[in-house]
Amino acid sequence: MELPRLENVDLSGKRVFLRVDFNVPIENGKVTDKTRIEKTLPTIELLIKKGARIIIASHLGRPKGQTNPEFSLAPVVEVFKGLVKSNVYFSKTVIGDEPIKLSKELRDGEILVIENVRFHKEEEENEPGFSKKLAALADVYVNDAFGAAHRAHASTEGIAHLLPAYAGLLMHKEIVELSALLAKPARPFVAIIGGSKVSSKIKVLNNLFDKVNHLLIGGGMAYTFLKSRAVPVGNSLVEKDFEVQAFQLIEKAGVAGVDLQLPVDHIIGDQFNEKAKTKSVDKMGILDGWMGMDIGSKTVSNYEKIIKNAGTIFWNGPMGVFEMDKFAGGTMAIAKAISKSKAKTVVGGGDSIAAINKAKVADKITHISTGGGASLEFMEGRKLPGVEALKKKVSE
């Protein structure tokens, strides 16, 4: 996939509108994981080296088109300032007099971060007038926000048609790594898919069947699969509307010659919180009044053996209720198993990345994808609007 590249473009003295994905987790006003900020630093450092005047834009959370202090980028900017050596300024508004004035005052290599673009409903509506107001801040557009590339929004798609547009280094790396994963994976190719809902993973599971050798299922979605096979799942999360599709996926795996693995034992809880009583149960099923909260030790062992012999691994989604420590064991075990593998490893999705970081094995992973939904949609074989807008620039 050919994308317009930054490396050979003269950007000295030019204002560059850089769309990044600074949609990071924040608790009590503090950034708790700065992975997405760090991942875009190579592009920012390249722009600084080229003497560009950088205007950074990002979304944060879902403020529903209204100004909401809870979703302000201010705490993100404070973290960002500690990661770059250039002067960093912050505009408390997205469009209007303040960002226009500040963008014109920038010197070569300096950075202006504008407020959360989703404070304006026109952003998600991809409203042409709003795109023009964003474009008025700059001479050149660079998209490094792979995590938002599946959205046809003003700052990810609309603006790309109004300025000379290029892919950032992270955007390019994401596309190269994920394309290779689908086109020429080393065998055996193992996909580990977790998370709470089958409904959000149906399409990617279907698209992976003709590409993978092993499909390992975990997380809450596993219980819809097990229920479809008449395994007692107690009070576990089950999407009743997707039981038939889950059963069809199991059958499809058999026809395609894909080894689809489901949990054979579980860590269960009597309530969905940290105070829950816990016990381990085997494949005979889960008792009424109890719910599956994590994969058990036998399942971990089964999955570890398959991971050890893999040539390529793609992991998206936790194996249990990872945010609760007593149910994080399965996810952490998978993170460590993947880190020990000699395979090419690609990890995507917030909880999976959090587990990799918590296990302190990020340096052992070939590629950590910053795109949760975007990487899934790419793996589904879908076109990403933010990427398509850049591809059009190559053909023009």
UniProtKB/Swiss-Prot annotation:
The lineage of its organism: Bacteria, Pseudomonadati, Spirochaetota, Spirochaetia, Leptospirales. Belongs to the phosphoglycerate kinase family. It catalyses: (2R)-3-phosphoglycerate + ATP = (2R)-3-phospho-glyceroyl phosphate + ADP. It is an enzyme of class 2 (transferase). This is Phosphoglycerate kinase. Keywords: ATP-binding, Cytoplasm, Glycolysis, Kinase, Nucleotide-binding, Transferase. Pathway: Carbohydrate degradation; glycolysis; pyruvate from D-glyceraldehyde 3-phosphate: step 2/5. The gene is pgk. It comes from Leptospira borgpetersenii serovar Hardjo-bovis (strain JB197). GO terms for molecular function: ADP binding; ATP binding; phosphoglycerate kinase activity. Its main location: cytoplasm. One of its GO terms (cellular component) is cytosol. The keyword Nucleotide-binding applies. Substrate binds at residues 21-23, 36, 59-62, 118, 151. It holds the Pfam family PGK. Monomer. ATP binds at residues 201, 292, 323, 349-352. It is found in: Cytoplasm. It comes from the Bacteria.
